[in-house]
Amino acid sequence: NLPALVSGSHADSVPQGGNYDGLAGIVAALTVARWMRETGYQPERDYTVLMMRMEESSWFGKCYVGSLGMTGQLTEKDLALKHRSNGKTLAETIKECGFNPDDLTTGKPVVDLSKMAAFIELHIEQGPTLDSSDEYRVGIVTGIRGNLRHKTIRCIGQTAHSGAVDKQFRHDAVLAFAE
């Protein structure tokens, strides 16, 4: 028995993440499974569809919660994180979904990772690169930037006309912060 080829994505999204943020990958993975069944195609290894939740950091300030939980790597500190709009903890939210949050902090994977050969995720582009290209319609991503937000930082300064007031006399808060 060879380890399975796993495909899927996350069901959550970020604000303005696009209509099909992670869902495109779930639908694509299910479409492949349906095609295999309908055509009778039998791959050399099992094909598994995987859907995760809470991969985005927009609600609890931590990304990959679903993956970390699936691999038993969540911590008590993670479970105490509060939802940005309703104030419920991650542990409360997991319980409301019908799961025991304590099962996700044991250090033991919920799934047997040795039975997975690879994970393939089809994902929409959330930027303009492919959309503006006449040549490329598909891209392969080799890395992405991290996600870090500072919601409580304030830049305080004075406004001044950039054409009339020399830079040395301005107190531009954003410029000072950037420098």
Where are these regions (language model features)?
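Acidic/His- and Gly-rich active-site-bordering loop/insert found
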Residues: 1-18, 36
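Short coil/turn connectors at secondary-structure junctions
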Residues: 2-5, 42-47, 114-117, 148-150
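General beta-strand structural signal in soluble alpha/beta enzymes
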Residues: 7-9, 49-51, 155
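Midchain, well-structured core segments that form catalytic/ion-binding scaffolds
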Residues: 12, 54-179
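Short, conserved micro-motifs enriched in small and acidic residues
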Residues: 16-27, 167-175
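"Short basic amphipathic alpha-helical interaction patches in structured regions
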Residues: 20-26, 39, 48, 64-65
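Short glycine/serine- and small hydrophobic-enriched flexible loop segments
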Residues: 31-38, 179
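Short helix-loop-beta-strand segments that form the rim/entrance of peptidase-like active sites
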Residues: 36-58
